[in-house]
C-alpha cells in the first residue's frame, strides 16, 4: 500500500512539475536549454541563410510522419495554356530542327547563328520574365516542358535556354532589383538583346560557394568623368555557363568597407552585382570544353575593376545581402532546370533503347525477349516514369507559390542519378551502336555528357551527404528550428519562454510519432490507411508510406537526440536518413502522377515497380 501511495505522490509531483509553467521552466526547461546551447553547433550567417531560405511543402508532411493525402490529391494536374502549348508545338519544334548535336560538338563548336537568333527573337531567354517587361511569363510547368523537350534534341540548345531562365540576372532582378534596374534590363533580357551569365563558382570554392575568395573594396573612383562612391572588385571565376558570349555578367563577391564609407560594418558580406561585358577590366571570351559538349561555358576574371555601387542588384542598400538573395532564388531554378533536362535525356534514352530492342535480332529473336534485356528495359521504363513524376510535381510546387529548397535538392539529386542509370542501361542494350561516335549515334553523346548534370548546382555527393537530411531535418521538423532560434535569442527571458514552448511540443510530437510507428508496425499498416483518398489499387502503397513516414519521423528524432550537433559530421548516417526522406517523396510523386493522369491501367505496373 505504501508503495502505491509513493508512486501516486511521484506521479502527482511530476504532473505539477510539468503543468505549472514557472516551476517547469526553472527546474526542467532552463537546464535543458543550457545543455542544448552547449551541444548546438556553431552556425555562420551564410549557413543560417541557407537553412532558412525557401519554403517547406509536402516533404515536411512526410518528415513529420503524417502525410496529408487530401492536400496532395487536391493539387490539380498541371496544364499548359493555349499560348504555352502553341510555343511548345511550333517555336520549340522549330528550334529543335535548327540544331544538330553532331554538327555543334564536332564541327562548328557552337550552335548555328540562325539558332541563336531564333531563340533570342522568339523569347526563349525570357520565359520567366513577366509580360509587363516583354517576357513570356510562362508557368514553371511550361518552362519545364520546354527544357525537357529541348534536351531530347541537343544539350547545348537546352542549356543555352535553361540557364537564363534559372538562377541568374533575370531571377534576381525580378525579386530584388530597383525599379530602374528592372525597367532597363528586363525588357532587354526578354528580347534577347542581353545574354546573361551569372558568375558564382571560383576555382577554390566550388560546392562551398559561401567561401568564395572574390572580393570588392568600397572606395571612391572616377565613373563617367566624376568622382563616385563605388567598389573595386577582383574576381576569378570558372565553369560559368554563357560567360564567353554574355553581354550582362552577374557577379557574386564578398564586399568589404575598411574605411567605413557605408557605415561601421567592415565585412558587408556576399554581394551580387550586374556588370556589362564591355565594362573596363572585365575579361570574358575564353571557353571550357565540358565533356566534349560545346555549349558556351568558360572563365571570367577581373582585377580591381572599379564600378559604381549602383551596379549592385537592388542598389547600395542590398550590399551584403547577396547570399540571402541567392539562397532564396536557388530553390525555384534547381527544382526545374536539371530535373527537366535530365528527365528529357531519360525519355530520349528510353525511346532509343526500347525501339532498338524491338528491331535488333539475335539468334533469330528480338533482343527485347531476352530476360537480361527485359530487366534493363524494366528499369529504364520505371526510372523514366519516376523521373517525369518528380519533374512534374516539383514544377507544380513552384506554380503553387512554393520555393521548396529540400524538394529541389531531392529532385536534382535523384533525377540526375536515375537518368545516369537509364543511360547506362540503354548503352548496354545498344552495345556497339552507342560506342562509336558519329552523326547517327544518338546515345553516345548523351552518355558522355551525364557527369555535367551530376556535378553542377551542388555536386551529388555533397547533396546526398550534407543537404538532403542536414537541411531537411531543420526545415521540415516542426520544432527543431524554433528550438535553435530560441537558444540563440538575444533576450534570455524570451528565449527561455520560446524554448519551453518548442521543446515540450517536441517531446509530445516524438512520443506520438513513436507510438504511431509502433502501432502501424504491429498491425502491418492495416490502420494506416489514407481513408478514401487516392486510387483503390494504390491504397496499400499509401498505407505502407504512412507507416514508413511515421517510423522515419521517430527515427530522425532519436538520431538527432543521440548525436546532437555531431550529426553535422556524420555524413554517411545523414546520407542514409536523407535517402529515406527522398524515397518517401519519390513514392509520393509516383502515386500523384498515377492519380492525376487518370489512373491508366497500363501504367499501374510501372507505378507499382517504382514503389
Residue positions per predicted region:
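C-terminal helix-coil-helix/basic helical segment that borders enzyme active sites and/or dimer interfaces
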Residues: 385-414, 427-430, 434-435, 564, ...
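Flexible, small-/acidic-enriched active-site or ligand-binding loops
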Residues: 280-306
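C-terminal amphipathic alpha-helical interaction region
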Residues: 505-611
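Glycine-rich phosphate/cofactor-binding loops in nucleotide/flavin-utilizing enzymes
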Residues: 434-534
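A glycine-rich, basic-preceded beta-loop-alpha segment at the flavin cofactor/substrate interface
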Residues: 299-334, 351-368, 515-536, 548-568
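Amphipathic, small/basic residue-rich leader segments at the start of a protein or domain
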Residues: 11-164, 171, 176-195, 207, ...
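Terminal amphipathic helices with adjacent charged low-complexity linkers/tails
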Residues: 359-375, 595-602
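A short core secondary-structure module
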Residues: 226-282
Amino acid at each position: 500500500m505504501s508503495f502505491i501511495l509513493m508512486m501516486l505522490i511521484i506521479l502527482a509531483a511530476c504532473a505539477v512539475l510539468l503543468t505549472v509553467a514557472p516551476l517547469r521552466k526553472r527546474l526542467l526547461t532552463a537546464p535543458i536549454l543550457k545543455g542544448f546551447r552547449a551541444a548546438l553547433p556553431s552556425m555562420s550567417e551564410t549557413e543560417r541563410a541557407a537553412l532558412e531560405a525557401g519554403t517547406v511543402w509536402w516533404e515536411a508532411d512526410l518528415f513529420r510522419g503524417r502525410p496529408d493525402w487530401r492536400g496532395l490529391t487536391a493539387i490539380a494536374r498541371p496544364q499548359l495554356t493555349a499560348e504555352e502549348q502553341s510555343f511548345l508545338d511550333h517555336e520549340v519544334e522549330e528550334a529543335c530542327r535548327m540544331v544538330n548535336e553532331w554538327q555543334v560538338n564536332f564541327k562548328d563548336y557552337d550552335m548555328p547563328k540562325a539558332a541563336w537568333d531564333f531563340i533570342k527573337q522568339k523569347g526563349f531567354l525570357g520565359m520567366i520574365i513577366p509580360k509587363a517587361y516583354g517576357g513570356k511569363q510562362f508557368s514553371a510547368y511550361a518552362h519545364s516542358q520546354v527544357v525537357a523537350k529541348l534536351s531530347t534534341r541537343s544539350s547545348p540548345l537546352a542549356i543555352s535556354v535553361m540557364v537564363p531562365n534559372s538562377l541568374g540576372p533575370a531571377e534576381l532582378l525580378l525579386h530584388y532589383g530597383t525599379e530602374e534596374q528592372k525597367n532597363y534590363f528586363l525588357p532587354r533580357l526578354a528580347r534577347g538583346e542581353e545574354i546573361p551569365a551569372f558568375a558564382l563558382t571560383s576555382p577554390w570554392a566550388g560546392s562551398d560557394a559561401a567561401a568564395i575568395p572574390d572580393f570588392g573594396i568600397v572606395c571612391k573612383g572616377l565613373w563617367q568623368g566624376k568622382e563616385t562612391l563605388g567598389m573595386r572588385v577582383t574576381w576569378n571565376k570558372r565553369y560559368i555557363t554563357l560567360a564567353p558570349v554574355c553581354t550582362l555578367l552577374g557577379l557574386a563577391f564578398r564586399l568589404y568597407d575598411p574605411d567605413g564609407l557605408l557605415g561601421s560594418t567592415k565585412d558587408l558580406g556576399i554581394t551580387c552585382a550586374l556588370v556589362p561585358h564591355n565594362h573596363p577590366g572585365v575579361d570574358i571570351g575564353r571557353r571550357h570544353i565540358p565533356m566534349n559538349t560545346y555549349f558556351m561555358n568558360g572563365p571570367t576574371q577581373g582585377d580591381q575593376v572599379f564600378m559604381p555601387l549602383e551596379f549592385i542588384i537592388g542598389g547600395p542598400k542590398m550590399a551584403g545581402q547577396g547570399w540571402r538573395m541567392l539562397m532564396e532564388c536557388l530553390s525555384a531554378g534547381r527544382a526545374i532546370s536539371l530535373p527537366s533536362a535530365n528527365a528529357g535525356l531519360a525519355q530520349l534514352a528510353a525511346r532509343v533503347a526500347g525501339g532498338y530492342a524491338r528491331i535488333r535480332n539475335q539468334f533469330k529473336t528480338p533482343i527485347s525477349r531476352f530476360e537480361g534485356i527485359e530487366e534493363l528495359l524494366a528499369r529504364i521504363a520505371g526510372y523514366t516514369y519516376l523521373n517525369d513524376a518528380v519533374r512534374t510535381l516539383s514544377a507544380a510546387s513552384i506554380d503553387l507559390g512554393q520555393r521548396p529548397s529540400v524538394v529541389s535538392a531531392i529532385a536534382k539529386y535523384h533525377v540526375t542519378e536515375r537518368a545516369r542509370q537509364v543511360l547506362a542501361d540503354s548503352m548496354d542494350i545498344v552495345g556497339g551502336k552507342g560506342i562509336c561516335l558519329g552523326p547517327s549515334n544518338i546515345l553516345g553523346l548523351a552518355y558522355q555528357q551525364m557527369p555535367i548534370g551530376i556535378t553542377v548546382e551542388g555536386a551529388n555527393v555533397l547533396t546526398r551527404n550534407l543537404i538532403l537530411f542536414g537541411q531537411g531535418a531543420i526545415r521540415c521538423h516542426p520544432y527543431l528550428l524554433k528550438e535553435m532560434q530560441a537558444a540563440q535569442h538575444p533576450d534570455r527571458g524570451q528565449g527561455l519562454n520560446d524554448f519551453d514552448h518548442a521543446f515540450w511540443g517536441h517531446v509530445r510530437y516524438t512520443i506520438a510519432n513513436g507510438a504511431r510507428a509502433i502501432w502501424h508496425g504491429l498491425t502491418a499498416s492495416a490502420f494506416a490507411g489514407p481513408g478514401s483518398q487516392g486510387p483503390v489499387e494504390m491504397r496499400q502503397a499509401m498505407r505502407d508510406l504512412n507507416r514508413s513516414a511515421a517510423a522515419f519521423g521517430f527515427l530522425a528524432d532519436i538520431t538527432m537526440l543521440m548525436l546532437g550537433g555531431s550529426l553535422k559530421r556524420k555524413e554517411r548516417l545523414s546520407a542514409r536518413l536523407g535517402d529515406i526522406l527522398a524515397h518517401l517523396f519519390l513514392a509520393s510523386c509516383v502515386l500523384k502522377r498515377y492519380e492525376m493522369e487518370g489512373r491508366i491501367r497500363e501504367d499501374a505496373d510501372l507505378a507499382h515497380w517504382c514503389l
